[in-house]
A protein has these predicted regions:
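Ser/Thr-rich, Pro/Gly/Ala-heavy low-complexity intrinsically disordered linkers and tails
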Residues: 18-64
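Beta-strand/beta-sandwich contexts
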Residues: 57-106, 110, 318, 327-354, ...
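Extracellular beta-strand elements of beta-rich domains used
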Residues: 108-109, 114, 192, 257, ...
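Extracellular glycan-recognition surfaces and repeat-rich motifs
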Residues: 115-156, 162
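Secretory/extracellular carbohydrate-interaction modules
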Residues: 145-240
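Short, aromatic/His-centered strand-loop micro-motif at the edge of beta-sheets
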Residues: 234-256
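Localized edge beta-strand/strand-to-loop motifs within extracellular or lumenal beta-rich domains
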Residues: 253-269
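Flexible glycan-contacting loops in extracellular carbohydrate-active proteins
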Residues: 281-323
Length: 396
């Protein structure tokens, strides 16, 4: 995207997120098949000027095997380690997925609905657009922006200006059913990148400022999860879970945000920059959210993202700028990540990958480098549908 007013799709025709290059086809290891019409060589001693025979390869030892276990195991990863390239991951216990890839991957610059739009234009909610809602009467409209985008991206979403400033959000994505999510949609995994220009709890009054709301309907009564800058509230729980964004989040920089809501297990798990946000309450101390309940009167509806951005309804954040993008939403925990540390627990910078094929023993992904500044020397992780992960990363 350009800083003036040319159409956004001038840079979106071949979205970087989905650029895919296949490795070149290779022939036989000896450089090609022998000519069938060639005469058979004399089985005796070779001519004096003949090339010496190739060395006999030494035993390389047994091929690696998966062995026993219950977690995904990566044995090999083939392909170039560059953004947009195709990587094939082989191993075992990945699980099967007949429909690989997220339900929605919105990198902004990969949305055909934004063709012809320019920097500063309002994000549309037309029938072909990914989102059905942009803001509210008390919020700033979300617009397209490009200034200081993450590496390999041409655009992102921005809320800024006016009396409400950084108060802006998108909601009810079409790919997940809009305001009528299907009844069997009881698990959501959501990942996105978020950059606040100021402390999202630094206004006066402070407010309760939502990063994301997950609902089953947009009526006055609903099942809900609301993650704010200081706590998380949810239906069914007897207490609010407290934890400040600024413990692990960074003002003025891009932050990886993740949340998993599972209505069948009754669990909510959320993360900032790879750190699990274990919450606390004065009555019990720290605790995990294992008592989330979807209200039975809404059994005909599943879960969807009602709000994503920054939602507060106050004027005390008028000077704030809210940037967000690279939104990945799926109905399974299964995914592929590349991280900055040799164990999953140590990773603090992870980039989610885009799967194009998935079976129990093989996964194909389109590589996303993000801001890792190179993929070689990083570590590969596969998470299965149950949330199991290879704790020891596979070195790239």
């Amino acid at each position: 995207m350009r800083p003036s007013t040319p159409p956004l799709l001038m840079l979106l025709i071949v979205p970087a997120a989905w650029a895919c290059t296949s490795p070149p086809a290779t022939g036989p290891a000896d450089g090609g098949a022998a000519d069938a019409a060639s005469p058979v060589a004399d089985a005796g001693s070779p001519p004096a000027d003949a090339d010496p025979p190739p060395p006999v390869p030494q035993d390389a030892g047994p091929l690696p095997t998966c062995g026993d276990g219950t977690t995904p195991t990566i044995l090999a990863a083939g392909g170039e380690r560059t953004h947009g390239a195709t990587m094939v991951i082989t191993g075992c216990r990945f699980g099967d997925d007949d429909a690989p890839g997220p339900r929605l991957f919105d990198a902004v610059d990969n949305q055909p609905a934004y063709e012809g739009l320019s920097v500063g234009d309002v994000v549309p909610t037309d029938e072909d657009a990914p989102w059905t809602r942009n803001g509210s009467p008390w919020a700033t409209e979300v617009r397209l922006a490009e200034e200081d985008a993450r590496p390999h991206r041409a655009a992102f979403y921005r809320a800024a200006g006016g009396s409400h400033g950084g108060d802006g959000f998108l909601g009810w994505p079409r790919a997940l059913g809009g305001t009528r999510p299907p009844a069997d949609q009881l698990l959501l995994y959501v990942s996105w990148w978020y950059r606040p220009s100021m402390d999202p709890g630094g206004g006066e009054p402070e407010g309760a400022n939502k990063f994301i709301r997950i609902w089953d309907n947009d009526g006055a009564e609903r099942s809900y999860v609301s993650w704010t800058h200081m706590h998380i509230g949810y239906s069914g729980g007897e207490r609010t879970g407290w934890r400040s964004f600024t413990q692990d989040g960074r003002v003025g920089r891009w932050n990886r945000m993740e949340i998993i809501v599972d209505a069948e297990r009754g669990t909510v798990r959320h993360y900032v920059n790879g750190v699990y946000q274990r919450v606390s309450h004065s009555s019990v101390g720290e605790f995990d959210i294992d008592d989330y309940q979807k209200r039975p009167e809404f059994a005909d509806l599943g879960l969807n993202v009602a709000v994503l951005g920054f939602d507060h309804g106050l004027t005390s954040y008028g000077a704030m700028v809210t940037d967000f993008g690279e939104i990945y939403i799926d109905t399974t925990r299964a995914r592929v990540e590349i991280g900055d540390a040799p164990t999953w627990a140590e990773t603090r910078h992870r980039e989610i990958q885009l799967p194009t094929a998935w079976s129990d023993g093989s996964i194909e992904v389109t590589l996303q480098e993000g801001s890792l500044e190179g993929l070689s020397g990083r570590y590969l992780y596969v998470i299965d549908a149950e949330g199991n992960v290879n704790e020891e990363g596979f070195p790239l």
